[in-house]
């Protein structure tokens, strides 16, 4: 059955949103894996665990916001299999933050590609939606993760275990 509310919503935009939903769910899944890795008794970095759990919830919320947008515009949701995270063991806090930084950059690039598709199909509503709810937040997240990677390296991580402990306690534990 065709949507009654669909207007100025190109099939390419609809398909790109479905791909972005999948990527946001993959990011959520990856962060959830990181969170419970750092919660293990042999890793025991609760600040990292809490931070990655929050990131997982935020990425899931991003996916849900896109699902709602798809319905509001009269698009159809086609969920795909969510890929398993690239690893099960995340190593040090520095290793995990470097993975998170790359993940956020990948999500950002995908959002920029999505914005380009909606611009090419003259969809100002979708462009505004992405600019308002996603693009600025992504840039801020990338900057924060980059700063944290720099600070951990400056403290001597991953060779210096005390560096990660103090970062966990004082930066992530606030």
Curated annotation (Swiss-Prot):
Binding site for Fe cation 2: 59, 104, 138
Tissue specificity note: Liver (at protein level).
Binding-site residues, Fe cation 1: 24, 59, 62
Keywords attached to this entry: Iron, Iron storage, Metal-binding, Oxidoreductase
One GO BP annotation of this record: negative regulation of ferroptosis
Superkingdom of source: Eukaryota
PROSITE patterns attached to this UniProt entry: FERRITIN_1, FERRITIN_2, FERRITIN_LIKE
Gene Ontology CC entries for this record: cytoplasm
EC number(s) stated in the UniProt entry for this protein: 1.16.3.1
Catalysed reactions listed for this entry: 4 Fe(2+) + O2 + 4 H(+) = 4 Fe(3+) + 2 H2O
Domain Ferritin-like diiron, chain residue ranges per copy: 7-156
Role, per record: Stores iron in a soluble, non-toxic, readily available form. Important for iron homeostasis. Has ferroxidase activity. Iron is taken up in the ferrous form and deposited as ferric hydroxides after oxidation. Also plays a role in delivery of iron to cells. Mediates iron uptake in capsule cells of the developing kidney. Delivery to lysosomes is mediated by the cargo receptor NCOA4 for autophagic degradation and release of iron.
Subunit structure: In liver, forms a heteromer consisting of middle and heavy subunits. The functional molecule forms a roughly spherical shell with a diameter of 12 nm and contains a central cavity into which the insoluble mineral iron core is deposited.
Name of the protein: Ferritin, heavy subunit
Organism: Trematomus bernacchii (Emerald rockcod)
